[in-house]
Regions:
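N-terminal ligand-binding lobe of clamshell/alpha-beta domains
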Residues: 1-283
Length: 283
C-alpha cells in the first residue's frame, strides 16, 4: 500500500465548508482549490457559487453528496450544525466546528483555518491589516467624540418576529463603528432565543437613534418597522434612520463582518453624527 505522507503535511486537500465565512477566507488566502463543496447560502465570493458544488443549507446538509466528494475535512459553525457534524463523524469524516461569537474569536478562527492549510504567515498578515483598519476606525470615532460628536444609540434587529437583537460580534463591531448597542446585556447571550425581546415596547423605551435591520437573509422593510404600533416617536423612526445591513455582510462571523459589514455601519453612524452635531449647533 502506497501512502503519500507528505501530502498530509500540507493540511486538508478536499474541504467542504458548511458556512460562508470559511469559504470566503480560503478564497482570500488563495486556497480555493482545496474547496470541494460549499453552503447553498454562500454569496461571498460570488464566483464560489459558480465554481463549487452546493451541499448544504444552514441546518441541513446532503450527507450522501458530501460523502461522494470524499472530503478530508469539513468546516462547520456553531451548535446549530452539531447534528450534521455528528452524522458526518459517524461516517468517518474529519469535522472541525468553530463556535466564534466575538470579534476576537473570529480572528482566532481565521488564524486556525489559515494554519490548517499551511498559510499561517499569510493569515497573520491579512488579520493584521483587518485589525489595523478596525483600530483606525475606532480612533477616528474617538477624535469625533472629543470634538463634540455624540455616539448614537443603535438597535440592531437580527429578526423581526420575534424581535432578536444583535449577536456579540455585531454589537462589538457596532461599538467600533461609533454606535452604542441599545441591548448590550443581550449581546453576551450566544443563542438567538436568548436575545429575543418579547416586549417591543422595551425597544421603544430605549429610543434608538439608528435602527439597523439584518433579517437573516429576509429583506429588511423599514416601512414595516416605522408602522409598528407605538414606534412613531422613536428617534430613529422620526428621523428616518432605518437601514439594512445585508446579512452576508454582517451575520457571517468571518472576513465580511470585519470589513464590509462594519464599514457600512460606520458610514451610517458617521452621517448621523455629522447631522446631529449640525442640528445641535443651530439650536
Amino acid at each position: 500500500m502506497n501512502i503519500n505522507i507528505a501530502s498530509h503535511l500540507q493540511g486538508p486537500q478536499r474541504i467542504v465548508c458548511l458556512t460562508e465565512e470559511t469559504t470566503e477566507w480560503l478564497y482570500l488566502l488563495g486556497q480555493e482549490s482545496r474547496i470541494v463543496g460549499i453552503s447553498g447560502y454562500t454569496v461571498r465570493p460570488a464566483k464560489a457559487r459558480q465554481e463549487k458544488p452546493k451541499v448544504s443549507a444552514f441546518l441541513s446538509a446532503k450527507i450522501d453528496k458530501i460523502l461522494a466528494l470524499k472530503p478530508d475535512c469539513v468546516f462547520g459553525f456553531s451548535d446549530l450544525q452539531a447534528d450534521i457534524a455528528a452524522e458526518l463523524i459517524r461516517k468517518g469524516v474529519q469535522v472541525t466546528v468553530f463556535n466564534q461569537r466575538s470579534v476576537s474569536e473570529i480572528f482566532s478562527m481565521l488564524y486556525q483555518v489559515a494554519a490548517m492549510v499551511g498559510q499561517a504567515a499569510q493569515g497573520l498578515e491579512k488579520i493584521a491589516v483587518m485589525q489595523t483598519d478596525l483600530q483606525a476606525m475606532a480612533e477616528a470615532v474617538s477624535v469625533r467624540v472629543a470634538n463634540g460628536a455624540r455616539r448614537p444609540k443603535v438597535f440592531f434587529e437580527e429578526w423581526d418576529v420575534p424581535h432578536i437583537s444583535a449577536i456579540r460580534w455585531v454589537s462589538e463591531l457596532m461599538g467600533i463603528a461609533g454606535g452604542d448597542d441599545c441591548f448590550p446585556e443581550l449581546a453576551l447571550e450566544p443563542m438567538g432565543k436568548q436575545r429575543i425581546i418579547a416586549d417591543g415596547a422595551e425597544i421603544v423605551r430605549r429610543d434608538p437613534d439608528i435602527i439597523f435591520g439584518s433579517w437573516c437573509g429576509k429583506k429588511f422593510r423599514p416601512e414595516n418597522v416605522a408602522a409598528r404600533l407605538g414606534w412613531a416617536d422613536v428617534a430613529a423612526v422620526k428621523n428616518q434612520q432605518l437601514f439594512e445591513i445585508k446579512s452576508p455582510d454582517i451575520l457571517q462571523p468571518g472576513p465580511a463582518a470585519l470589513t464590509d459589514g462594519v464599514k457600512k455601519m460606520h458610514a451610517f453612524i458617521i452621517a448621523w453624527m455629522d447631522a446631529d452635531q449640525r442640528s445641535r449647533a443651530i439650536a
